[in-house]
């Protein structure tokens, strides 16, 4: 009974990481070797990255893939920061 499973949306922190580093969409697109519109689609969750693109983003930001992409929504950064401080 092999059917095709609908593709799940991946949640990401791409926009947060881009803004933290003061990068435009075009600058990030150039670094990842994609069109700037692709960056917008990724940030809005309208497009899931290929494995290669996800790995390139992780390498560019020097973060593990799971820090950028997740199947579950990320909690707000403020929640994570305050939970981490004693």
What does each model-found stretch correspond to?
Residues 52-67:
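DNA major-groove recognition helix of helix-turn-helix/homeodomain DNA-binding modules
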Residues 2, 59, 69-86:
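Short, charged recognition helix plus adjacent turn
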Residues 25, 36, 46-47, 65:
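The DNA-contacting recognition helix of HTH DNA-binding domains
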């Amino acid at each position: 009974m092999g059917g095709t499973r609908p593709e799940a949306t991946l949640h990401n922190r791409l926009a947060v990481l881009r803004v933290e580093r003061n990068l435009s969409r075009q600058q990030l697109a150039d670094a990842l070797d994609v069109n700037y519109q692709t960056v917008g689609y990724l940030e809005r969750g309208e497009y899931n990255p290929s494995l290669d693109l996800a790995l390139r983003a992780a390498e560019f930001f020097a973060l593990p893939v799971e820090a950028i992409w997740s199947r579950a929504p990320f909690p707000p950064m403020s929640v994570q920061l305050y939970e981490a401080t004693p």
